[in-house]
Amino acid sequence: MEVSKQALQNIISDEERLLFAENIPAEYLSDALGRRTGTADALVFARSTEEVSGVLRYANENGIPITPRGAGTNLVGSTISLFGGIILDVSRMNRVLELDRDTMTITVEPGMLLKDLQAYVEERGLFYPPDPGEKASSIGGNISTNAGGMRAVKYGVTRDYVRGLEVVLADGTVLKVGGKQVKDASGLSLKHLLIGSEGTLAVITKCLLRLLPKPETTVSVLVPFADLGTGIRSVLTILQANANPTAVEFMERKVVALGESFSGVQYPRPDAGSYILLTFDGHESEVNANIERVRRLALDNGAIDYIVLRSAEQAADIWKVRGALVMAVEAVSEQEPVDIVVPISHTADFVRYINELEASSGVRMIAFGHAGDGNVHLCVVRDGRDQQTWERELHDNMEQAYAKAYSYGGVASGEHGIGISKRPYFLRETAQENLAVMNTIKTALDPKHTLNDQKSYIVGGK
């Protein structure tokens, strides 16, 4: 059914927040990569739960597809409107609704950006630990993909900081799940069902988040090793020693060289084959004790140096290279970003396999990521291939990479989500029984499949 302008105008009184067909900007028809494009009949900028509910109810009654959207930083096509219909944008729902110091919680709208939330709470002596790399992502999007980031090794992922949600189901029903209480053994955890569902089950309209006291101090350490295998083995020893690092990143020298070239910052010890970059936070005495403990462990386990980054400027430069790696690759060539996860005991094995796959296939594959949790970020680089060759070789290499990750007991994504681009590999590697349960839940909550259909786990549908 065609989208009725009048019907949407009856729900959204402000016409500036309604765009139709040819007036919809191109960036709203894609994800952050901009390499896949959808179509849409209408773009709606909602400002309230009531408006979200009204739009969903109208769409459900008329069989109109809905694509939820936040800041649009998604990398796997979750925000691409595959079947036309309505793009429901909640980016203007971006307010802090309540800060409750007694329960150490904050309630925000889904369009609030991660960087704004972090700044808001840190100015007040508080701390929101989840820290995915894209700081301009929205909190609703972080919840929808269960985003993680570098601090997951110590603090966990977004799921661990969501106390409650207000969501709107496909038929317009407003649902409130969770709350300010710490414990809950009352029935099924609907909150956890919704987290990570990539907009396929409901649209988030309010987020109740758990906060911590802001750490007293934060110090980073750069540890060079002769090779990645030695570095990763050292990480396992560090984690088992209760040194409690906040972040543990790994980078091979060939990857660091790209980041250096792009950022203009040079790493010390260019003779190293790999680097482990750690951060410690907490009380100053605790941080210093952990730094010293890890110094002994690292040097005893093959580190060729141990560089404590005491100045904020020095630490910022070192982290600038780490943060620039994806942009450094993009500056050279189109690339497909992947965030496969393996058990931490297999991180070095998996990266070694990726290097072998690169050599055998001739397709450049650049791996780095979170050594503390086994989340490997992989850039598969196009390097001038024509479209047909690129699509074929990308698919072949991805099939092999995902198969190897699953053979180690890994999964398809640690924080980006599945969306469109990872869906074929996820569907192939996931047990049919698991997919059947997921799709039964989808059909129960969205029987008409109006919400983000044919994304992630969904089979059948339209």
Model-based region annotation:
Residues 1-462:
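Noncatalytic alpha-helical scaffold of FAD-dependent oxidoreductases
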